[in-house]
Amino acid sequence: MWRLSRPPHPFRDWRLPLRSAPAPSVVRSPRFGDDWWQRGVIYQIYPRSFADTDGDGVGDLQGIIDHLDHVGREGLGIDAIWLSPIYPSPGLDVGYDVSDHTTVDPLFGSDHDFDRLVEEAHARGIRIVLDLVMNHTSDQHPWFMASRASRTGPYAGWYLWRDPSGHAPDGTPLPPNNWVSFFGGPGWEWEPARQQFYFHTFLPQQPELDWRNPAVERAQLEMVNGWLDRGVDGFRLDVFNAFLKHPELLSNPSQAGTSPWRRQVHRHDRDQPDFPDLIARFRTIVDRQPGRMSVGELFDGTVETAARFTSGHHLVFDWELLGAPWNPQALRRTIATRDAVFGSGRWPTVALSNHDQPRHASRLAASAGDPDVDAVARAAAVLLLTVRGTPFLYYGEELGLRDVDIPPHESVDPPAAMVDADFEWWDRSRCRTPMPWSSDPSAGFTTGRPWLRLGPDVETLNVRTQAAEPGSTLSLYRRLIALRAATPALQIGSLEPVTGADGSVVAYTRETADQSVLVALNVSRERTRWTLPASPRSTRWRLLLSTADPRAAAVEVAAGEAIEMSGDEAVILEAVGPS
């Protein structure tokens, strides 16, 4: 429990005709705080795993509608929900192999259900962000089926087709270059019908579109317009920095590495110098309707690359915090580095978990060998919602959900079945398990058999149970998000690491012209004493929140005094009174 080292002070109480691609927009200097997505919190829903209403064991759009109040103003207080892909798909990459970008997969419901979801969400002040998979399609997409059938048809040049670079002595055609697949193995697949290779960064059933073909760009932007016309408020762009490849498809340089993918410098198959021009054209489409946003998923890149591709009002995911261990030195370094790289002119994102990575409750506690997973998850919630940038909260994190051990025969993640001595992979099924709504059979997720097994701890890690407990992780998230919404410094303030913070405490201030907020995390399972720093605004700090004691609030402490913090505790304080 958070406490002073002496007795505390008293409490005080869509579809449009094809059109020419627009010219690049002029990137204007951002005014941080002008837009909802800078101040707000975005909640990622994995539709298969959120709530099932028809008993088939797979989540659906009606299930999301039924639980909007959980994420809305009366619940978490989320500003927007991001839906992982809801489009028709053969399901070989669990929805990221899209066969039609313009409609809803019947597995999840109908177009009417989607329109009702938009309407019901908007009525609650919740915006809708769609996942756009535009780097590649399914090999069952009509575009690819037409493209593979003919070298001369209207879709012949829509994908990355190339002739072989030669032939082996036995006559086997050789790939055009040395590019490989992120999922292991070669990146080029031979198509007998065309007598050519096509490229795929991921599965062979996910052929890459040729974004340098103007017809591809026009079709994609038409699709974007269609979803905007249906009321969508934003887009998450899957692996967006891989859209453009080198015009000549040059081979990548080699380097030392632990897998075929890591043994290449990916200079020519992503991050092309004219990529920002393409994104500017995309942003022109989105910006035609006020209040819309987009966030790009940086595919296998650095924080410097993320900052470089963040311009104007565009967000880009960076993975620095998502990959950092629960270690004070590592967290201090990561927080300071990402803020310095983005600087004052670019707006970052913050994410600790998603559908491709271990849940942060499991990952962070394991990285420190800390058995108190709940305490680590709660302190990490403070980190997520108080560092500078737009927070993205993955469904179930508000309960402190852990990864679930999935036996290999139950895995629903194709690359996990390809693991060998030259290809390592973490089974993503483990972080995609169903949302537990109650302690009832099947956790209130379905009346049937869930598509993935539930975690063993749903008896306590479920919405109904935690909603009734003031000290639960869910209650903490509700308080945290409400506090953030009422505290401009936590939304749009500058970030300054606290100099002199050492040992196990990671501390930083968030400041606006009118407000100064101090955040401190004890990144250790051991108790610690920590001296509160001075503030140019005040000689006192008022406690706003403690992860160790839901009742602790309004205690005032003088700058320079020491406080005691429990293991894995985080506190938020505000400067009060004259300096």
Where are the predicted features?
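Acidic/aromatic-lined carbohydrate-recognition and catalytic surfaces
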Residues: 2, 11-14, 18-225, 229, ...
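Alpha-helical scaffolding within the catalytic cores
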Residues: 27-30, 300-304, 332-339
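Short, solvent-exposed loop/turn segments at secondary-structure junctions
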Residues: 48-50, 87-89, 134-135, 204-205, ...
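Hydrophobic residues within beta-strands of alpha/beta enzymes
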Residues: 81, 235-237
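Solvent-exposed beta-hairpin/edge-strand motifs
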Residues: 534-550
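C-terminal beta-strand-rich structural cap/linker in extracellular carbohydrate-active enzymes
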Residues: 555-579
